[in-house]
Amino acid sequence: MSKTHVYELAKKMGVENKELMARLKSLGIEVKSHLSVLEDEDVQKVTAPPTPPKGVQQQEEVRVTTTVIRRRPKAVAQPPEEVAPAAVESAVIEEAPAPRVEAVPEEPKASPAFAETVPAVEEPKGVEPKIGVPKVETPVASESKAEEPRVTAPPAQPKPVAAEEEKPTMNRARILGRVELPGLTTASKPVPKPAERREVVIPPKRKMEERAVTPQPAAPVADDRKKKAKTFTEPETPAGGAPGAKKGAPGGKKKEAFKKAELLEKRERIFEPGPKTGKGRRRERESVTFGKKTEITVPKAIKRIIKISESITVGELAKRMGVKATDLIRVLMKMGMMATINHPLDVDTATLIAAEFSYEIENVAIDTDEMLESAPDTPESLKKRPPVVTIMGHVDHGKTSLLDAIREANVIAGEAGGITQHIGAYDVELNGRKITFLDTPGHEAFTAMRARGAKVTDIVILVVAADDGVMPQTREAINHSKAAGVPIIIAINKIDKPEAKPERVKQELMEFGLVSEEWGGETIFVEVSAKKRINLPELLEMVLLQADVMDLKANPDKEARGTIVEAKLDRGRGPVATVLVQEGTLKVGDYFVAGVHSGRVRAMQNDRGDKVLAAGPSMPVEVIGFTGVPDAGDVFISLSDEKKAKEIASHRQQKLRETELAKHSKMSLEQLYDKIQKGEVKDLNAIVKADVQGSVEAVSDSLRKLSTDAVRLNVIHSSVGAITETDVNLASASNAIILGFNVRPEPKASAMAEKEGVDVRLYNIIYDAVEDIKKAMEGLLEPTLREKYLGRAEIREVFSVPKVGNVGGCYIQDGKVLRNASVRLLRDNVVVYEGKMSSLRRFKDDVKEVATGYECGIGLENYNDIKVGDIIEAFEIEKIATKL
């Protein structure tokens, strides 16, 4: 037994899959899709010629046996008796509107009959009758002539009633109408509603003959039918009086005239209540509006309100108000502001300008603060949290040494110049209780970061060296702490030194209102030694005691909120930020927004490098998953909706761009006049690159403070990462210098800088960079030491030599390496070590130099932490006279 798929059978039958499936379901054959399998019996059922329902067959047999159609041409009066009277009336009624519907046949006399049949085919079944129309044309035309003598005009008036009463007769007469009874078919098929709709569409103002022939049927081919109807205007007009047309006798003209009057009467009756549509209405509207004069209108009050977000350009504002941009610029000049068409205007300025033209400005900027608001915490939801402690103090007073002593980790050895290079956050546990420490650099360049640290901290430990006393940076730290309302604990460090004078330190601090408890004050003083580990437990106990007094609490059961402590760009992990969670719990997978950046927490690590799945209040974690490097001090907010986080970040980015553009493009007439009077202002442009975001901001702020009346220092670009070719191109175009802090330029960038003559200055200590630029601006810069690049070597293998240490098996990539040259070890373009070379060998022989393309062994002086893939950069120091 063969099986056939539905789609195969549909292809053979030439029908669509859906159509065949519908037919199968109507036959009671269940199929799920076009891939369903059909049995042979089912195929035979479908392919068998369709048989109409039994009721219809009986009706057909009765109609055919009565031979109603064949009697009509012979006897005019008898057929109406055999056929239902209502059917005859409906047939007579339909003959009047029929000529308006369609006039497709070629013969003038046959066209009325065909016109009668077309609506009959169209109305009952919608689409199918259209297919059957051409088949009916010839027989209908011939037999309509025999039928027409029986039709009389008077019965046409009761048309609407008769048509509605004879709906069942219509359905029975449809099949007969195809063969022999066009009159009955016409009467049964059309439904009154569509017929009325067609007539209503016809414009009433046309001439009698055209209106009788050109209806607007609901069929898709209305336009073609209208054209054909117009062509056969003469013969179709008598179609309403088809009997006269059939006889061909002189009385036909009378019939035509009578039919015209009847049609006119009907149209007047139908068209009076109906609304005007189509071309007639359009022509009437055009005729009315053609004679009107153009009026100059004033916009409505609601249209005179312009909605803007934060700012708007002059051109856009002019466009919305419908005025010329030059008029707006003229108003701005009267207000003392030079502007172009692309000049951005803030809300206040735009409001003043719009008022000149009788417009109002409405600020529709998104309120991100409102979107990020959280419900206040209930007292029951608050739980105790660890204190956050910030260590502050002057340069080289021992802040990092003290913190390292507490953490029992000796990481101070690699610090350059005794200065902490970036903010760090650490978690320390003491007697089952945790304390979070923030380590801030002591140089004045980090004023902004220290202020941010004071905002997130609970307690400040102010480190003062017993042998040095109170210094300028110590005063700044005290001022920041007092401004933030943070309690201060004084740690007098280096008491193990012979020259230590802790009593003098206490006396100096009294000037700032910090009086020791021993002297009757309220400030806690602890004498410690980070080097000798003296009194460290006592210091931590004082911190915990102060925390108990403050009763620090937070709600861990909510979306996390915190602060960005530090951020950097890691080559392997992308943007990485240290986040201090202040309330709520941050989990892996949470969406967040921080400043102008958003993201999703992909991974978290604590200060020891261990992976963390959740971080509660007062816990610092390193978060991976930012879209960009955020700024230190940005508020970190966890959100449940990614779309919301992206929307807020996008809005903040746009706002930042508009603010920056407005800040750089503003220039008033007074400023322009001052510049002309003073002459050309000398600008010193600088590009700042550093290893972490906090250092970038600190260097940029310090450089901006160095601007004087003679020389203005502009930081045109600052970012995290190595110095690249893009930076060199920008410096070359802007006539700027490049300042690198703890980063190195890429090889191609170094070559381009030398070719373009761009001054690239590299520093390990921010203080040196600021002092050098300050001296250069003052003309006091001494002959400087310039670095001469020699070559680069890549470590491809690491060998451990007894009593010597690790030696790197290197390949010289470019230049040459000299034995007495200084070297720098780079890991991901970040300086890891800088010093001297202890050995340079080839095949167990000491050599003076190794050129490009050769391999050699290089040992570093007092340094063994070398890895495969590290770069050793060789250089020499030259003394060159400095030119301003």
From Swiss-Prot:
Region (G3): 439-442
Annotated spans, G4: 493-496
InterPro entries per the UniProt record, alphabetical: EF-G-like_DII, IF2_II, IF2_N, P-loop_NTPase, Small_GTP-bd, T_Tr_GTP-bd_dom, TF_IF2_bacterial-like, TIF_IF2
Binding locations of GTP: 393-400, 439-443, 493-496
Residues in tr-type G domain copies: 384-553
Subcellular localization, as worded in the UniProt entry: Cytoplasm
Annotated stretches, region: G2: 418-422
Comp. bias regions, Basic and acidic residues: 194-212
Keyword Nucleotide-binding appears in the UniProt entry: yes
Major localisation: cytoplasm
Leader sequence segment: none
UniProtKB keywords: Cytoplasm, GTP-binding, Initiation factor, Nucleotide-binding, Protein biosynthesis
Keyword Transcription regulation assigned: no
Domain of life where this protein originates: Bacteria
Region spans: G1: 393-400
Low complexity composition-biased segments: 234-248
Region (Disordered): 42-62, 123-254
GO molecular function, one term: GTP binding
GO cellular component: cytosol
CDD domains: IF2_eIF5B, IF2_mtIF2_II, mtIF2_IVc
Region (G5): 529-531
Alphabetical list of PANTHER family matching this protein: TR-TYPE G DOMAIN-CONTAINING PROTEIN (PTHR43381:SF5), TRANSLATION INITIATION FACTOR IF-2-RELATED (PTHR43381)
Family in the record: Belongs to the TRAFAC class translation factor GTPase superfamily. Classic translation factor GTPase family. IF-2 subfamily.
Cited NCBIfam families: IF-2, small_GTP
Name of the protein in its database record: Translation initiation factor IF-2
Chain's gene name: infB
